Amino acid sequence: MKRGSFLVLAAVLMVFAYLVYYSFSSPYTVTSDDAKRLLREKKVDVVLDVRTKMEYNLGHYPEALHIPTANLAYTAETLIPNKKTSILVYCNTGQRARYATELLVAKGYTNVKYIAGSYLTLTR
């Protein structure tokens, strides 16, 4: 029984490690320090908040464009018509931002990055 429990625990830990690695390994990922630098150097045209309206209302990056992930597929091209626009995407954990970034890239946007982690790191 102990051996079986150990194998299950080991398998769960391996899956967890893979998911963490996958979450933060993308050519579109930037660290909070890199994001701050891009913003400071004015290399970002649009800061995109993909959280829910309630999350956005609780606090957001100044001048962030708010498009919840659920609405992004059908509103992005209207609200951000130039597909060469430099876009920095954020959410609370990086998961929705990653999804949103992949969606934007699939729609033809060529200069999209997302913050691996919480947007709160931008304000510190």
Regions found by a protein language model. Give the residues of each.
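Conserved beta-strand scaffold positions in the cores of enzyme catalytic domains, especially
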Residues: 47, 64-66, 112-114
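Structural motif
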Residues: 39-40, 56-59, 79, 104-107
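Catalytic cysteine-centered active loop of the rhodanese-like fold, especially the PTP/DSP P-loop
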Residues: 76-123
